[in-house]
Amino acid sequence: MAIKQPKGKTVRRLGVNIYGNPKYDKLLDRKPNGPGKERGARKRGKTSVYGEQLKEKQKFRFAYGISERQFRNLYKKASRMPGVTGDNMISLMEQRLDNTIYRMGFAISRAQARQMVTHAYFFINGKPVNIPSMCVSVNDVITTKNKKGIQNLIRHNMSTSQSARGSWLTIDDEKLSATVNILPVTTDIQPVGNIQNVVEYYSRNA
């Protein structure tokens, strides 16, 4: 489910460019204060621990385009997995098909990747897929629909995309395909926020 919020206001409210588009860096330089916080206005008191946890949760939710229900379920799944819950959460978010397409450099944003998946631009192991939230697995092969318009769009995106490509993927720029070699790990990813705060938020609001 896509999250429909004004991206500029979201970036200003969270104080970080969660979408990766350089125009939001410029926006934060011009307007570093959150929406409604005018220059010279009396500052509010220090944000509570709960407030900080909520803010970090929203950073991840909006960056990956995940609904509250999906994100809570993702936390529950991660908490049942072996290992560190926060690391598991990041890995699960990165395994989402829409994010994988974004990490392949085939889309300039996760929102665009989500739309492309919904329109069934891709195949996994030869089968058409249209569910952005599905998770890829090791040895999955992702290929592109053989339509000139789709492939031209992807090649254009590849030339303009500024996202960091996933080191866990082997990407074939000529064939417009990728293979999942390993599952993504946090050491290969620059998180958009403090995932431990997110874990603490859900552990106290389960």
Curated annotation (Swiss-Prot):
One of its GO terms (biological process) is ribosomal small subunit biogenesis. GO terms for molecular function: rRNA binding; structural constituent of ribosome. Residues 25-39 have a biased composition (Basic and acidic residues). Pfam families: Ribosomal_S4 (PF00163), S4 (PF01479). Residues 25-49 are annotated as: Disordered. Disulfide bonds: none annotated. Belongs to the universal ribosomal protein uS4 family. This is Small ribosomal subunit protein uS4. The lineage of its organism: Bacteria, Pseudomonadati, Spirochaetota, Spirochaetia, Spirochaetales. The gene is rpsD.
